[in-house]
Regions:
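GHKL (Bergerat-fold) ATPase N-terminal catalytic module, capturing the glycine-rich phosphate-binding loop
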Residues: 48-234, 241, 248, 261-264, ...
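GHKL/Bergerat-fold ATPase module in large chromosome/replication-associated machines
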Residues: 166, 184-207, 227-231, 237-741
Length: 741
C-alpha cells in the first residue's frame, strides 16, 4: 500500500491542517514507530514509518552546552559518588512507570522480573546499570537525554554554583554519569509494540551518536566507561558501599553480584542474586502491621553501634503534604554536637542527605531515624527552605507529633517517664529554647528535678516553693545548683533555711534559665552561690554590719589585694552569725550565667573574653573577721596614719574646688581650678594606689587573711593547683604551731 519517497515509507494518506505536524512526525517516526504527519509538498496527511537504516545519526547535544562537561567533572569533584544514586534512581523510576502503565491497562505484556542489575567489569573498566523498565524509543532518547535531562543538569549546575548548598546535590540526573566516565552508552528498547532498539553514546563532549541498538528485551542499560581518575568505582567494595548508602531502601529490587557462602574453608559465590536493598522499609508500612521488634531491628540496621532508643514515632500523612518516616528518641549524651546528622532524608525511598538542618526544626536534628517526603524541594538552597511554606507545614507537623508523643508517655506512665527524663532532658531543653511552638506544648511534659531526685512539672514546682521563696518584690526565686558536690555547703545552707534547690547541670540549662525567666511570670533563678543565703531571696530583713566604716575600708583593701589573681575580686560585709563561715565566695548570677552560655557559643567571645569576677563576703560577726581587723589595725597603723595624713588635705582641697565650681559650666571654670583639680585627682590616685599596694602586701603575708580567703575559695571548689598546695602547707603549719603552744 505504501510507497517510498524522501527516505521514508508512506503507509497511508489523510488530511491535516497543521503544517508543523510533518516535521514532528519525521522525528517520531525515526524512533521506529509509525505516526500520521503532514507532508507540505503533497498537502496531505501521511502515515509514515522509518526503516532501521534511517535511524543512524550523529548530533550535537546543544550549542549552549560547550562547558557543561568539564563543569560536571570538576565542579562537583567532592561529590562524584552521587552518580550511582542518580542512575539507579532513574532505573527505579523507569520500572515504576511500567507498573503504572500496567495498572492503567496500557501495557498488557508480562512485566516479569523487575530486578535492577548493577554489573561491574574491571577488565573492560565498565559499570552497567541495567533495568527492565519502560525503555526508550529513539525519539524519546532525543527528547529525554539530549533535551530534558540536559536542561535539568544545566539548571542544577547553575543553582549549585549560585547557592552552593543544593540539598544532597539531588537532581543532577543522567548527566552525573560523566563525573566518573570517559564515555557513556545507552542501550535501550521501549515497551511500545514495534519499537526498535536504540544505542546512544557520548564521550563527554557535545557530540553524540544515535543508532539502532541490539538489545532484545525491554528496558535500558546505562554503561559507564570509568575514567582513570575514578578507578575507585571499579572496586566491588566501593560500589557496595554506595549502594548501601544511597539505594538500600529503593522501591525496586537491586542486585549486585551473587550471594556468597563458605564452602571448603573459603567464600564462594552462589547462583542467587545479591539483593542489596529492602523494597518495603518500615516507614512505608502501616503501624498496625508492625511489632516493637520491627522498629528495634530497623533502628539497629540504621545505627549498629547505638544503644536501644527510648521510643519512636511513626509519621504518616498524605494531606496537605506527603510525609512518612520513623523517628527515634536516642539516649542523648552530654555533648549534643556529636549527636547531629542522624536523621536521614529520603525522597520516594531514595536517600538524599543526613544533614537536615533547614528542613526540620534545629532541635529535631538530635533525633534519629528517617523522614521521606516528595514534597520537600531538593533542588534549592537551604536558605530558601526557611521561607518555603510546605517545609514550614512539615516542620510544624513533626513538632506536633513529637509533642503529642511526649505528652502521651507522660500521662500514660509518669514513673517510667521520670526514669527516662535524664535521657530526654537535653532534647526537650533544646526544643524549648529554640522552637516557640514546642515550648508552648512543653508544659504538658517538661520536668524540673531537685537535688533530692524528685521531679515536678512547672506548675507543681511553683506551688511547692512560692510560699517560702518569694522575695520582698514579690518574685518567686528558684534556687538551683549546677554541681551538688562542688557547691555542697551552699546547697546545705539553703536547705537549712527551708528552701528547695533544683539540679540544673545540663549542657543547655544556662540558656533555659534565661528563657524561663522571660516566660514565667515574676520568676527569677539564682544559683546557690550567687549570694549569701540571707540575700539569695532578699526579704528585707538583713542585719546591719557591726564593723566600723574604717574597719570595712581597711579589710576590703587587704582582702582584695591578697585575693587578686586572674579573677576580679570585690569584698563586701554581712552579718551572717558567729556559727557561719568567716567568709564565703559568691558569683554574680548574670555574669556567671553569661560565661556558662559562652561555653556553648565559642564564636561569640563577648563574655568569654572578660575576666571572671567573684565577691568575697566577710562575715562581720565572726570572731576570725574581728581578729583580722585587730591584727590589721595594729600591723598597718603606721600606713593608715600616713595615708590619712597625705589623703585628707588633698581630698579637702579637691572638695573645696568642687564646691566652688558647682553649677558652673565647664568652659567658665577658671583655668587654674581645672589644672589644680587634675593635679589633685592624680595625687589622690597615686596615694591610694600606694596604700593599696601596702595593704595588699600585708594581706598576702598575713596567715589569718590567707587562711580565711582560701577557706572561702575551697568551699566553692575554687582552690586548685599551687594555691591548694599553699593552703595545705599553711594549714599544717598552723596545726603544728598550735600543738607547740
Amino acid at each position: 500500500m505504501g510507497r517510498n519517497t524522501d527516505n521514508f515509507t508512506v503507509v497511508a494518506l489523510n488530511r491535516c491542517d497543521k503544517k508543523s505536524c510533518f516535521a514532528i512526525g519525521i522525528r517520531i517516526a525515526r524512533a521506529g514507530v509509525a505516526r500520521w504527519c503532514f507532508h507540505p509538498r503533497w498537502k496531505r496527511k501521511v502515515f509514515i514509518r522509518f526503516s532501521a537504516r534511517d535511524m543512524a545519526q550523529n548530533g550535537k547535544i546543544g550549542v549552549s552546552t560547550e562547558n557543561i562537561f568539564p563543569i560536571i567533572k570538576k565542579f562537583l569533584y567532592s561529590d562524584h559518588e552521587i552518580f550511582l544514586r542518580e542512575l539507579v534512581a532513574n532505573a527505579v523510576d523507569a520500572t515504576q512507570k511500567l507498573r503504572t502503565l500496567a495498572k492503567a491497562g496500557d501495557f498488557a505484556g508480562e512485566a516479569g522480573d523487575e530486578t535492577i542489575e548493577i554489573r561491574l567489569d574491571r577488565e573492560a573498566k565498565t559499570l552497567t546499570i541495567s533495568d527492565k523498565g519502560i525503555g526508550m524509543t529513539a525519539e524519546e532518547v532525543e527528547k529525554y537525554i539530549n533535551q530534558i535531562a540536559l536542561s535539568g543538569a544545566t539548571s542544577f549546575l547553575d543553582k549549585y554554583k549560585d547557592a552552593g548548598a543544593i540539598i544532597g546535590h539531588f537532581g543532577l540526573g543522567f548527566y552525573s554519569a560523566f563525573m566518573v566516565s570517559d564515555e557513556v552508552e545507552i542501550d535501550t528498547l521501549s515497551w511500545q509494540e514495534g519499537a526498535k532498539p536504540v544505542r546512544w553514546s557520548c564521550k563527554g563532549d557535545p557530540e553524540y551518536t544515535l543508532a539502532e541498538g541490539s538489545r532484545a528485551t525491554r528496558g535500558t542499560d546505562v554503561v559507564l566507561h570509568i575514567s582513570a581518575d575514578n578507578a575507585e568505582f571499579l572496586e566491588k567494595h566501593r560500589i557496595q558501599e554506595l549502594l548501601q548508602k544511597y539505594c538500600r531502601f529503593m522501591a525496586v529490587p537491586i542486585a549486585f553480584g551473587k550471594k556468597t557462602t563458605w564452602k571448603d574453608g573459603k567464600e564462594v559465590e552462589t547462583d542467587e542474586p545479591n539483593i542489596v536493598n529492602d523494597v518495603a522499609p518500615i516507614w512505608t508500612r502501616k503501624p498496625a502491621e508492625l511489632k516493637a521488634e520491627d522498629y528495634e531491628k530497623f533502628y539497629h540496621a540504621l545505627y549498629p553501634m547505638a544503644e536501644e532508643p527510648l521510643f519512636h514515632i511513626h509519621l504518616n500523612v498524605d494531606y496537605p503534604f506527603n510525609l512518612t518516616g520513623v523517628l527515634y528518641f536516642p539516649r542523648l549524651k552530654s555533648n549534643f554536637d556529636i549527636q547531629r546528622n542522624k536523621i536521614q532524608l529520603y525522597c520516594n525511598q531514595v536517600f538524599v542527605t543526613d544533614s537536615v538542618e533547614g528542613i526540620v526544626p534545629e532541635y529535631l536534628t538530635l533525633l534519629h531515624g528517617v523522614i521521606d517526603s516528595p514534597d520537600i524541594p531538593l533542588n534549592v538552597s537551604r536558605s530558601y527552605l526557611q521561607s518555603d511554606q510546605r517545609v514550614k507545614q512539615i516542620a510544624g507537623y513533626i513538632t506536633k507529633k513529637v509533642a503529642d508523643r511526649l505528652t502521651e508517655l507522660f500521662k500514660a506512665d509518669r514513673a517510667q517517664y521520670e526514669a527516662k527524663w535524664d535521657d530526654l532532658k537535653l532534647f526537650i531543653t533544646y526544643g524549648m529554647v529554640t522552637d516557640e511552638k514546642f515550648y508552648e506544648r512543653s508544659s504538658e511534659f517538661a520536668l524540673l528535678k531537685n537535688v533530692d531526685g524528685k521531679y515536678f512539672t512547672f506548675t507543681e514546682y511553683r506551688e511547692l516553693v512560692q510560699g517560702e521563696q518569694t522575695d520582698k518584690a514579690g518574685d518567686v526565686v528558684y534556687l538551683y545548683t549546677t554541681d551538688p558536690e562542688g557547691q555542697w555547703s551552699y546547697v546545705e545552707a539553703a536547705r537549712a533555711k527551708g528552701y528547695d534547690v533544683l539540679l540544673m547541670d545540663g549542657q543547655l540549662d544556662a540558656h533555659l534559665l534565661g528563657h524561663l525567666e522571660q516566660k514565667l511570670e515574676k520568676t527569677r533563678f539564682m544559683r546557690v552561690d550567687a549570694n549569701t543565703v540571707e540575700r539569695l531571696i532578699d526579704k528585707g530583713d538583713a542585719a546591719a554590719v557591726s564593723l566600723s566604716e574604717e574597719a570595712q575600708g581597711v579589710l576590703r583593701e587587704v582582702v582584695e589585694g591578697a585575693a587578686r589573681g586572674e579573677e576580679r575580686v570585690s569584698v563586701r560585709f554581712e552579718e551572717l552569725g558567729e556559727t557561719a563561715l568567716p567568709a564565703i565566695v559568691t558569683r554574680n548570677e548574670f555574669m556567671r550565667r553569661m560565661h556558662d552560655m559562652q561555653a556553648m557559643s565559642p564564636t561569640n567571645p563577648m563574655f568569654g573574653s572578660m575576666p571572671q569576677s567573684i565577691d568575697v563576703v566577710l562575715n562581720s560577726s565572726h570572731p576570725l573577721v574581728k581578729r583580722m581587723w585587730k591584727e590589721a589595725e595594729a600591723g598597718l597603723s603606721g600606713e593608715i596614719k600616713s595615708s590619712e595624713a597625705i589623703l585628707k588635705p588633698l581630698e579637702e582641697e579637691l572638695q573645696a574646688i568642687n564646691e566652688r565650681t558647682k553649677g558652673v559650666e565647664y568652659d567658665k571654670v577658671p583655668a587654674e581650678d581645672k589644672k589644680r583639680r587634675e593635679e589633685l585627682y592624680e595625687a589622690i590616685d597615686a596615694a591610694k594606689k600606694e596604700r593599696r599596694d601596702k595593704f595588699a602586701e600585708y594581706g598576702k603575708n598575713n596567715v589569718l587573711v590567707g587562711q580565711v580567703i582560701d577557706l572561702a575559695l575551697l568551699s566553692n571548689n575554687m582552690l586548685k593547683g599551687e594555691a591548694l598546695q599553699r593552703f595545705v602547707e599553711r594549714s599544717v603549719a598552723i596545726v603544728v604551731g598550735a600543738q607547740q603552744k
